[in-house]
Amino acid sequence: MVDARTDELRQAHDALAELYADRLAHILDRMPIDRAVLGLFCDLVLDGGLGTAVGDIGCGPGRLAPYLAGRGLQPRGVDLSPEMIRVARRDHPGVPFDVADVRSLPFEDSSLGGVVCWYSLMYLAPSDRPRAFRELARVLRPAGYLATAFKAGDNRLRRGGRTVGVEFDIYWLSPEEMRRQATDAGFHVVYWAGRPADPDEHQPQGYLIAQRR
């Protein structure tokens, strides 16, 4: 049975699928720091001999797929929202996408060289974070890499989506919290960074790359 919080998040992102596809389609072109962190992740996976299979967890409309594929990886996206997956399949027909929850991923144990969670872990309730990080570790090969971006803040619960007509829970996460969750799940943090908010953003952004032990 899906809990009310998860159902609200799914419905909200179903409603936002086309808007996100339009707004985010080429946003990486305007985000050099995000590209740099993703590029570092790609280099670590490929240089580590971990293969090319990577998961894009909370992929939304699939905006990262062209970049990851262009760097020589083979992404597979998953998202909680069926509408996000429908749009991702339409816009990126050469990439596999599936409906799935980060707390229960459709990947075999130790099957991926890397996983990307780009602004997707911030939707998890605090009680769900340990399970999600353990699940990410489960699907990674030994020495595989996790890369995540998140809205950096004080870990307090906020309500998001109101400016676009929906509502859902969201957390602005502290770097300390993200490092702790990764470490507790069996990761070794190899990189973390942050940047100030851009003019069209309301909060700083954080980045973390961690390697499965």
Which stretches of residues belong to each language-model region?
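Short alpha-helix
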Residues: 170-185
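Conserved beta-strand signature within the Rossmann-like core of class I S-adenosyl-L-methionine
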Residues: 143-150
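Short, glycine-/aromatic-enriched active-site segment of Class I SAM-dependent methyltransferases
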Residues: 151-169
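A short glycine-rich, Lys/Arg-flanked "PGG" loop and its adjoining helix->strand segment in the class I
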Residues: 130-142
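A short acidic, Gly/Pro-enriched loop at the edge of an enzyme's catalytic core
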Residues: 103-115
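Conserved class I S-adenosyl-L-methionine
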Residues: 1-49, 154, 196
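Class I SAM-dependent methyltransferase SAM/SAH-binding core
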Residues: 53-57, 61-104
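Core SAM-dependent methyltransferase catalytic element
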Residues: 197-213
